[in-house]
Amino acid sequence: MLSSITVRTKSGRLIPLVLAATLLAACSGRISTTPPAPVQSEATASADYYLQQMQQSSDDSKADWQLLAIRALLREGKLPQADDLLGQLPSQLTEAQQLEQRLVSAELEIARHAPQQAQAILSKLDISLLSQAQQLRYYQAVIAAVQGKTTLAQIRAYIALQPLLTQENQRKSNIDATWTALNTLTPADLNSMVINANEDILRGWLDLLRLYQDNRQDPALLKAAIKEWQTRYPNNPAATMLPSALDNILHLQSDSTASIALLLPLNGQAKVFSDAIEAGFNAAKNGAFNQNSAAVTTDGTPTAQVDAPAQPDVNAAGAVSTSTQSADATASVLPADSAALPPLDAAGDPIAPSVSPGNPDAHIQVYDTSSQPLPELLSQAQQAGVSLVIGPLLKNNVDQLNTISTPLNILALNQPEQVQNHPNICYFALSPEDEARDAARHIWAQGKRTPLLLIPRNPLGDRVAKAFATEWQSLGGGSVLRQTFGSSAELRSTINSGTGIRLTGQPVSITPAQPTSVTIAGLTIPAPVQPPVASGGGVDAVYIIATPAEITLIKPMIDLANGTHNGISLYASSRSYQAGAGPDFRLEMEGVQFSDIPLLAGSDPAILQQAPAQYRNDYSLMRLYAMGADAWTLANHFAQLRQIPGFQVQGATGTLSASDNCVIQRKLPWLQYQKGSIVPVL
């Protein structure tokens, strides 16, 4: 046995000689070595640092540093370099390195906007083998790989991600993101979901969504329902940290409407429009639109039709654009042999009015936008104690709102070309463009995918085409075709030639929307601008913007050139609606669907008959009268529109809701000519 040799240190302690020699050798001959690479941890350093460590490391740890460098390159937005380095990984990797290789490969595919490839990679990963940091990245990747329609897998990923987040702001953001994703699910999505018995958190989220959708029209009922839900699901993260949108609703304070300012042009060409809006506003304020009268008269028939003289479209001059009618057009409600149309929900069931009438004692002040600059009028209104402004009406005035700073809540009666999100401004437009956007949504919902716009060869047609195509592409549609026509004389000439109208248009050119970004593993990457998807196959839907006289010529020519059983659905705007037309016209229009505001579609003939005669006898002014009534309703629910996603009111101009930028969207009733009658499209 070797003898134990010891050395006495200066402190008097004894240590083995071999150990002392080792310590001395370590101190005198220290060699600089690369620290171990934490391949399963967070990669917080720069790509240059990891690349340097990779160059200095041995073969055993080189791949670890290489994987960390790839992640850093992704975070820095250097996708080509990350891709090159990923391709240089050795073929022989440890199990831990292989897991990281697959995870970072999925992250790269997401950054390159290849979600399907990313999903294929992620589906092969065993989550149980991942570290906590890797699991966090995995669920972030699953969420980011669902670009577009929300899926159940994405909702589950949000739920699994929540306990992995360590900072309160991260947990709050994830709860808000979960809630946002849930609110994009359709009734069909919810009905088709299969929930496992152990998914109590998911079940709680879905119950919260249901009670929100059932009670969002009444904050008091919603508050009580949420309190009961928190008792039933105490372990759900939202039970102690509500989504911001829900929390805002529970603390919603309705804005005062004790004093309202109307900003309207009281002189010039637009005065007639202002008068109609003000009349409808005052009628609604005084309760004329709160009678909930039946959609038919006592003998079961709608009210009689009235003549509708033409009105000029002064949108080019900046005023609100209204649908025009030719002098021989008539319109108000459905003909006597048709069913009236009450407001319907998505299932086709009647909807009862869901909002309170507002404050009838509100003080109304009217300001003339044609006599003073808009900033001065807003300043005067503020000094007068006004709490809410309705208007301006003219488009050039509405455009100025982006450059004016005011604390007043504003319901503008038009919409600028480029809408900016202001927390105190909503936009309510009654225009052919607005109607075209609703038509795009309706046609899309009917399963059509290759529409053609048949529009007049003038600025009105251009504006409608742009609005329709923009909305269509926002829904996920491809390019939209447009085909123009000239005067009635030109249309008659085409009839005489016997050629008809062949549906062969040119793509509508629009400026693509700003691309969204993708955030993955801490990196926010702008999405590339994608060109519109080309529409495949033939035209399956035609949206027609024409007067009654024009559509009388157009419809037969479409049938002549394409046949009456061609599978192409025809849609028309309210511009072509001629309620007073006889059975011959209605038979000629067989199958055509068209939209109109509820008040003129027969939802409440009693209210229509109570309107002043000068508006009942003018189709376009009656629309503005209804717009004024809805302006009163919207003003009294301004806070809800701004803060409650999905909040709706049943108005005289449609079912009204607000987009993210508080642009009021109108869902219009759709009607159809069927065997000489007009029936609702359900």
UniProtKB/Swiss-Prot annotation:
SUPFAM superfamilies: Periplasmic binding protein-like I. It comes from the Bacteria. One of its GO terms (cellular component) is periplasmic side of cell outer membrane. A lipid is attached at C27 (S-diacylglycerol cysteine). One of its GO terms (biological process) is regulation of cell shape. Residues 1-26 form the signal peptide. A lipid is attached at C27 (N-palmitoyl cysteine). The keyword Iron does not apply. Its main location: membrane. It is a lipid-anchor. It is found in: Cell outer membrane. Belongs to the LpoA family. Interacts with PBP1a. This is Penicillin-binding protein activator LpoA. It comes from Edwardsiella ictaluri (strain 93-146).
